[in-house]
């Protein structure tokens, strides 16, 4: 009987648990949605409050800005008037100063231009003079070079002539010696007279030659000096040609053999020799005159060179002075140019200052315009903010109305959804429970009957044990009374304190143990009473495991009440037995104690533990009966 009812009720309990879980989930979802809606409403209220605060702040700000804008406009007008006055005063003063400075600078520029033109013309004149003097100096230098070249050539020719004269004198001596050997005594006398005269001439010529050689040495010393004459070239060249002809003729005569000389007449020969000597003497005189002329020309050229050098030095000094004046004029011109540029820069600075003042004036005008535009913009923004505030209030009212409507519709939908879900789940659970019960009914029928009989026998044993426990409890109570009386007597007699304290402690411990045993016995008695009631109730239920029709009839009744009563009694029974096991007195033996525990699995609906979700197991030990569902 009991097993049948448990098999019937367990799927119902499982289905109800699942329904409870689903309802709990739905309720949690509904609560979460409701909380979410409330949070949204709170957020909207907060936004509305923020918007109202912002509106108030904006109104205060607009009023403050309006006052500040008026003050700014007033200060701006005052500042603009003062600025215009200052600008006009500064412009008039600067124009006056600029006009005076401009006139002074123009005068100074004109003076400087005149001075520059005069310096330029003077510089041109000095440059022309310098060029002419430079050309004259170049001409003088060319003439000096030519004169030096002519003097050098003349000195060379003079040296050649002196050498030729020495050679001629030596030839003459040879001829004289030959003439002396070949001539007669008479002729020797005449020739000696002539030769003495010739010797005198030759000695004079030798003295002249020595003088000419000294003159040549002097010419060599002053070779590097400046001077010369162009007219000497033709004369020296002609004399040189004549001397060369005479020299060649004398060599020819010397080269003639002595036989031809003997054949010629001695007188003619001597006469020819005398003529040649006279010619040579004449040429020598001419050469001496030419040498004198060359010396005079050289002296004249040296004087001219000295004069030219002095003129050159004067011209160089003049050129230096002119260059110094030119540099001074250039520096003065540069200074004037710098002053002109400085004045020009001053003009530009004044122009820039005027432009800056004009720009500042324009900026102030633009700022005034901007302030006016800002005032207009602020007024428009204020109007827009007021309009936004009104719109937000309207939207808030609409949102509150929509919120109320949504709340109502949400409640209706929630109720409908819960009802439909409950109905659907009940139908599914009934179908599943019926299927599981059909499978488990035949299997657990015999086991339930045998276990019920065993439980009845054990309940009888428990009743006997409970009677014994009652008797023990009564005996314990009597002992406690006696101990209390003894303690009171001990207090009256005032025994030693140590014995007194030990007796009190032992008596208190025994008293506590007795109280515990009394409480445990009372709980065991209550559990036995509940177990008897449970067995009576199960025995009164008809055997529904034999037919499906009876099971359906049982399910058609209110199964919730059955589950509640069974669960309540079983749980009370479990609590009593657990407390009895915990508070069992130490004086009672373990063989006399009995425990009945009911263990229910927490994961009843899990598929991992059992496919059907139920497992009914009855185990019986030596001293206890365990019921596991």
From Swiss-Prot:
It is found in: Vesicle. GO terms for cellular component: cytoplasmic vesicle. The keyword Secreted does not apply. InterPro entries: FPP_plant. Accumulates in preferentially xylem cells. Interacts with WPP/MAF proteins. Binds to COG2; this interaction promotes the association between cortical microtubules and EXO70A1. Belongs to the FPP family. Ensures, when in complex with FPP3/VETH1 and COG2, the correct secondary cell wall (SCW) deposition pattern by recruiting exocyst components to cortical microtubules in xylem cells during secondary cell wall deposition by recruiting EXO70A1. This is Filament-like plant protein 2. It comes from Arabidopsis thaliana (Mouse-ear cress). The lineage of its organism: Eukaryota, Viridiplantae, Streptophyta, Embryophyta, Tracheophyta. The gene is FPP2.
